[in-house]
A protein has these predicted regions:
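Alpha-helical transmembrane segments of multi-pass integral membrane proteins
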Residues: 5-10, 23-47, 96-113, 130-167
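Residue-identity detector for threonine
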Residues: 52, 70, 88, 106, ...
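Juxtamembrane "helix-exit" motif on the non-cytosolic side of transmembrane helices
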Residues: 52-62, 114-128, 156-157
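Short amphipathic alpha-helical segments, especially helix-boundary/capping motifs
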Residues: 15, 100, 125-128
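Long amphipathic alpha-helical segments that form oligomerization/scaffold cores
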Residues: 77, 81-99, 108-116
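Individual alpha-helical transmembrane segments in multi-pass integral membrane proteins
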Residues: 1-90, 167
């Protein structure tokens, strides 16, 4: 559990660093691709933080079972995959209103948390004694597919990225 938690914290720090780097370098970008990904990692990292705190042994969310961290993990991965896909639309244009993306990400984050914690409408991902649910398994395939699809515009428009980014 300690190793897993350390790896989770490391990934959260990396997500925060990606956001900080992209945000502070935004005026130097010729397009909005990296900035969009950077902003999305702020939200992905926050969900990952809540995911890490949601483990049973942490005691932060009493009354929840092992489904909660699994739901949060899937929510973060969906957000991450969809952000990589959406970012490809900014390969040939600047992101002129990054605060709008921040506001949109905040709304998405709030809706995700409401669906998991308050409305409890987010599909179950893990059932104690049974294991992973079909939704969680299908989600992993769907997430992988979206990430693969996101590679296509990147390879077609790789000239839109700075040569050092392509290395």
């Amino acid at each position: 559990v300690l190793f897993h938690s350390l790896v989770e914290v490391f990934s959260i720090v990396i997500a925060g660093a990606i956001f900080a780097l992209a945000w502070n370098a935004r005026r130097y970008f010729d397009n909005g691709y990296i900035l969009f990904i950077g902003i999305s990692f702020l939200f992905v990292g926050f969900i990952d933080l809540i995911h890490t705190l949601a483990y049973k042994g942490m005691g932060v969310y009493p009354g929840y079972n092992s489904d909660l961290p699994t739901q949060l993990w899937i929510a973060a991965r969906w957000l991450q995959a969809l952000a990589f896909f959406a970012a490809t639309f900014f390969l040939d244009r600047k992101l002129n209103r990054p605060l709008v993306v921040l506001a949109g990400g905040t709304v998405v984050l709030i809706l995700l948390f409401l669906s998991i914690f308050y409305w409890q409408t987010f599909p179950s991902c893990f059932v104690e004694g049974t294991g992973l649910t079909p939704f969680k398994i299908a989600s992993e395939y769907g997430i992988s597919l979206i990430l693969l699809i996101s590679i296509v515009p990147l390879t077609k428009k790789k000239d839109k990225l700075h040569p050092r980014v392509r290395q």
